[in-house]
Amino acid sequence: MKILRIIQGVGTQLRSLSMVFSHAWHPRETLNYPEEAVYAAPRYRGRIVLTRDPDGDERCVACNLCAVACPVGCISLQKSERDDGRWYPEFFRINFSRCIFCGLCEEACPTTAIQLTPDFEMGEYRRQDLVYEKEDLLISGPGKYPDYNFYRMSGMAIDGKPKGDAENEAKPIDVKSLLP
């Protein structure tokens, strides 16, 4: 009985060693990160940015849907209104030390203002440095959707043009004319 246990123990040890040595000649998966570039998948969800319209205005209309959709509550913003009646965020803050990069804020945004980029290098030594303000998040370009403008697509009046005269917009429909 004792000899059988010894033979079993030696067998398991030899099996373990054979597994280790069989993997010794396989190619390594480890990368020397700063020197070698890491492949990020095309749909990788990384750092969040705020985009601008093709006109240069910020797309965010401070609807607060992103903050409501965020499961960890890392987004906070305050709505304000310009002279022309357009809403904008007075402040927009994301705490990246709490963010789980789930992408729900991007899906909830009706204006495509919030977009996730493949950037993943966000290491900081202090937690306070991971709280990004609106100025840190705004980029100069329109991001993934270069031709999209929320105010044109939604049919809201643009200064100097009545409804129906903007690009990609039809004249308002008179419902009574459709009746038999």
UniProtKB/Swiss-Prot annotation:
Its cofactor is [4Fe-4S] cluster. Binds 2 [4Fe-4S] clusters per subunit. The keyword 4Fe-4S applies. One of its GO terms (biological process) is aerobic respiration. Residues 48-80, 90-119 form the 4Fe-4S ferredoxin-type domain. Its EC number is 7.1.1.-. [4Fe-4S] cluster 2 binds at residues 70, 99, 102, 105. It catalyses: a quinone + NADH + 5 H(+)(in) = a quinol + NAD(+) + 4 H(+)(out). InterPro entries: 4Fe4S_Fe-S-bd, 4Fe4S_Fe_S_CS, NADH_quinone_OxRdtase_chainI. Keywords: 4Fe-4S, Cell inner membrane, Cell membrane, Iron, Iron-sulfur, Membrane, Metal-binding, NAD, Quinone, Repeat, Translocase, Ubiquinone. Residues 161-174 have a biased composition (Basic and acidic residues). It is found in: Cell inner membrane. Pfam families: Fer4_7. Belongs to the complex I 23 kDa subunit family. NDH-1 is composed of 13 different subunits. Subunits NuoA, H, J, K, L, M, N constitute the membrane sector of the complex. HAMAP family: NDH1_NuoI. PANTHER family: NADH DEHYDROGENASE [UBIQUINONE] IRON-SULFUR PROTEIN 8, MITOCHONDRIAL (PTHR10849:SF20), NADH DEHYDROGENASE UBIQUINONE IRON-SULFUR PROTEIN 8, MITOCHONDRIAL (PTHR10849). This is NADH-quinone oxidoreductase subunit I. It comes from Shewanella oneidensis (strain ATCC 700550 / JCM 31522 / CIP 106686 / LMG 19005 / NCIMB 14063 / MR-1).
